[in-house]
């Protein structure tokens, strides 16, 4: 099946040429390209393509070993006479053992039921990472702190970032308060550690190699701190200008590093496309061999610049010259065409080939890429029918592959954003189309709670209580139990409706409290208080000239007065009162009345799990 690997983008050149914006000459060229491709395919059945088949199949079947030794096969010896001998050995042990653990693929660990080094299954992983940073600070002035040790530490921090992100993304529901706090703590630790190492590198306190710099930049990129990548890159350029022989200046031009920074530099308008292309060619010619990272970076840059033909040409070169161990780069680039190519016909072609499994490499179609494609379609021409077509296709595809509910939730959330944007001013036709979509989704996959919750949350743009009632009835119709999240959305939705009563607010609030209590909650969560705030305070602020606004503020104060004893702690109570008043001035104007409001009309729920942590 790999005989098409070297010809992949030849196929896609036809897609570019036959797009709506293509010229007649390009159409003719595309047809000729397809004829040539067909002829070559028939004439080379037993030629080089079959040899490539055999070689790649051999690699992927395990007959040819492509395993790489840790740290590139190098090992930094420790001099037993060194005064830092014990600490260096401890650091090497932390790096070697923990780096090997964290490099284990998540999918294999889950299928083998092996504990992954994450916050739940193996807290010693994070202890080792923390220990490694402590040892680094003790040792960074010693001569044995080699570029390989610093690189391994940065690599370990990068793996820690990915481990944390993979765990959060694999959850079927949002993380609880403790998990969320741990997640933030770990990300902050990694960010602070990388900043410290970056400063040491720029101040020439420690060395690093190209692989380490690549991991450093990639870590910042994955955390969303691309501005820091640009800052560090500029500082390295200044160092290189002042000292052309500096090691950091040389390794910054390594293809693996340039491949990471090229799309960032272009996106931040540090370089234009011609300058990016020049840097790519200089780097390619100097090293005189294929570096997949460099090609992926230039392809991403080309897509950002809307240089789609250039991107396809580079993709063809990448496919032609890559070895079996590089198929991951090809798969990554395939996804980039889906998510970043502004020529929708090209992006959709890449999506279709992945869905139909027509490629000689495996493509895991990330839902974020599909969401980006839908966004690009809406941005280009607001073609909702095309968006709906892709949504239906992917619901079917993900359903056939039995992917987790979070994938569908992300896809549906994106899709219904465009649906309600299209029908925002036409709720009669919109409701008719919504009913059809619910039926279609049920036929394709089956109705699930997140699907209905997304519609509940977004249909509030119509400000129509009957629509909310209709969606709520679907829970019973399709035998979908309403969770605590659903109850929050239903309370929050009252903030989109005029002329509601206090009884409606209180009824929805009690439903939340009792459900939380039945689940064993010890306190009323922030999300519960936020739903109450949106139903009352937020509506009051948006309609402050309406007499009813003061009524809703009164209801909020009454309910808080009765139920604030179930706050987790004093900081949570501050958040729902003074903290909330900072964003909503209408609440600040009435906050002093908290202890004066009449609470006799607010019933107190009988609870078993909720604890009175605070006194009123």
Swiss-Prot record:
Specify where the region named Disordered lies, as residue ranges. Answer: 34-53, 60-79
Q: Name one GO molecular function term.
A: mRNA 3'-UTR binding
Reproduce the UniProt comment on modification after translation.
Answer: Phosphorylated. Phosphorylation promotes binding to RNA.
An example GO BP is:
sporulation resulting in formation of a cellular spore
* Cell location: Mitochondrion inner membrane
**Interval spanned by the transit peptide:** 1-37
The record gives the membrane topology as: Peripheral membrane protein
Function text = Binds the 3'-UTR of mitochondrial mRNAs. Involved in the processing or stability of mitochondrial mRNAs.
- How is the quaternary structure described? Monomer.
- The name on file for this protein is RNA-binding protein RMD9, mitochondrial
**Species annotation:** Candida glabrata (strain ATCC 2001 / BCRC 20586 / JCM 3761 / NBRC 0622 / NRRL Y-65 / CBS 138)
Source lineage? Eukaryota, Fungi, Dikarya, Ascomycota, Saccharomycotina
């Amino acid at each position: 099946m790999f005989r098409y690997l070297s010809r992949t983008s030849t196929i896609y050149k036809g897609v570019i040429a036959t797009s709506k914006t293509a010229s007649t000459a390009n159409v003719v060229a595309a047809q000729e390209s397809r004829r040539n491709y067909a002829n070559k395919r028939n004439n080379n059945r037993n030629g080089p393509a079959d040899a490539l088949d055999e070689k790649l199949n051999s690699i992927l079947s395990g007959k040819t070993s492509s395993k790489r030794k840790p740290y590139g096969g190098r090992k930094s010896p420790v001099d037993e006479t060194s005064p830092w001998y014990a600490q260096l050995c401890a650091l090497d042990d932390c790096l070697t053992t923990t780096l090997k653990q964290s490099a284990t693929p998540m999918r294999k660990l889950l299928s083998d039921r092996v504990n992954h080094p994450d916050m739940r299954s193996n807290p010693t992983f994070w202890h080792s990472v923390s220990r490694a940073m402590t040892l680094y600070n003790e040792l960074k002035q010693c001569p044995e702190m080699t570029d390989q040790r610093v690189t391994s530490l940065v690599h370990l921090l990068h793996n820690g970032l990915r481990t944390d992100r993979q765990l959060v993304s694999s959850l079927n529901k949002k993380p609880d308060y403790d998990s969320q706090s741990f997640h933030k703590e770990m990300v902050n630790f990694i960010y602070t550690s990388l900043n410290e190492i970056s400063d040491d590198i720029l101040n020439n306190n420690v060395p690093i190699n190209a692989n380490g710099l690549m991991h450093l930049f990639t870590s910042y990129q994955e955390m969303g701190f691309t501005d820091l990548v640009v800052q560090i890159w500029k500082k390295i350029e200044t160092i290189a200008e002042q000292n052309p022989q500096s090691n950091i200046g040389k390794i910054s031009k390594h293809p693996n590093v340039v491949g990471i920074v090229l799309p960032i530099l272009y996106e931040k308008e540090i370089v234009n496309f011609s300058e990016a292309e020049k840097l790519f060619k200089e780097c390619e010619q100097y090293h005189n061999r294929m570096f997949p990272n460099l090609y992926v970076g230039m392809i991403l840059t080309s897509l950002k610049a809307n240089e789609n033909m250039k991107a396809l040409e580079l993709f063809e070169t990448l496919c032609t010259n890559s070895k079996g161990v590089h198929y991951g780069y090809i798969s990554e680039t395939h996804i980039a065409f889906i998510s970043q190519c502004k020529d929708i016909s090209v992006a959709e072609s890449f999506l279709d080939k992945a869905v139909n499994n027509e490629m000689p490499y495996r493509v895991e179609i990330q839902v974020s890429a599909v969401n980006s494609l839908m966004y690009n379609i809406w941005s280009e021409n607001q073609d909702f029918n095309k968006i709906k077509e892709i949504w239906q296709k992917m619901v079917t595809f993900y359903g056939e592959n039995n992917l987790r509910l979070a994938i569908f939730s992300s896809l549906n959330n994106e899709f219904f954003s465009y649906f309600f944007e299209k029908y925002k001013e036409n709720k009669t036709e919109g409701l008719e189309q919504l009913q059809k979509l619910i039926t279609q989704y049920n036929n394709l996959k089956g109705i699930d709670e997140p699907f209905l919750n997304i519609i509940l949350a977004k249909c509030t743009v119509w400000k129509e209580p009957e629509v909310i009632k209709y969606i709520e009835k679907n829970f019973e119709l399709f035998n979908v139990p309403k969770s605590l999240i659903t109850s929050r959305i239903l309370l929050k939705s009252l903030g989109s409706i005029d002329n509601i009563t206090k009884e409606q607010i209180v009824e929805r609030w009690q439903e939340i409290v009792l459900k939380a209590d039945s689940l064993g909650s010890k306190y009323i969560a922030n999300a519960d208080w936020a739903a109450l705030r949106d139903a009352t305070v937020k509506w009051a602020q948006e309609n402050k000239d309406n007499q009813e606004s003061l009524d809703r503020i009164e209801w909020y104060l009454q309910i808080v007065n009765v139920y604030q004893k179930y706050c987790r702690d004093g900081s949570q109570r501050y958040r729902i009162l003074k903290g909330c008043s900072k964003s909503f001035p209408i609440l600040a104007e009435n906050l002093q009345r908290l202890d004066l409001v009449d609470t006799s009309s607010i019933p107190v729920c009988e609870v078993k799990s909720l604890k009175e942590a605070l006194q009123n």
